[in-house]
Amino acid sequence: VIDGQPMSVFESGAILMYLAEKAENFFPQQSPDRERVLEWLFWQVGGLGPMAGQVSHFVNYAPNFPGDHSYAETRYKNEYDRLLGVMDKVLNEREFLAGDYSIADIASFPWVTAYKRYEVDLDSFANVRRWFDAIKVRPAVRRGMDVGKEARNFGEGISKASLKTMFQQDAKSISEMAKAKEKN
């Protein structure tokens, strides 16, 4: 409920902004700190998240499909590595991405947790390693990371039907599925 009206908020960055503003925490109200948080939140939403998501797809799910995916996997792993380098450079100057712990760190942290699966040596990014180690011990982060832990399978043992649902849909097939649901 926003201003007394029911409303859904979607997209991770928008959700984090809404919650942080509502709780008055992890999102500064004054410039230039606010803009710095927004820069790094949008950097995650437009860069780190999508690139890490592509690495995840090609490492965890693409092997279930025929074809050579090595170019794509290498491409996204390299981009993920480059983005960790960007983080490492800024974290050399400050403790957290925007200075103080913020929604920018909250948004970015989950995408760094999979570094081992992506065959990245986090120790080659000393500042990211320090940042990662500081965040992973926060009690709320630990509780959050435990949610759904037993359900994570990273593509192992996933059924063909689930793979089709997750990766072989387009706008037309989704529309047809919605129409079929309406008939029932």
Question: Residues of each region from the PLM?
Answer:
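An acidic site on a long C-lobe helix of protein kinase domains
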Residues: S8-E11, D33, E79, S102, ...
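Acidic/histidine-enriched, glycine/proline-rich intrinsically disordered or flexible terminal extensions
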Residues: G148-N184
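GST superfamily/GST-like fold recognition
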Residues: G47, A52-S56, F96-S124, R129-I135
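Tryptophan-centric aromatic hotspots in well-structured domains and transmembrane helices
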Residues: F10, F42-W43, Y76, L84, ...
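Residue-level signal for nonpolar/aromatic packing positions in well-ordered secondary structure
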Residues: I15, M87, D105-I106, I135-V141
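GST-like domain detector, emphasizing the conserved glutathione-binding G-site
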Residues: V1-T74, D88, I174-N184
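A non-catalytic, amphipathic alpha-helix used as a structural packing/dimerization or gating element
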Residues: R36, R75-R82, V86-K89, N127-R130
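Surface-exposed helix-capping loop/turn segments at secondary-structure junctions
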Residues: N25, K89-D100, P139-G144
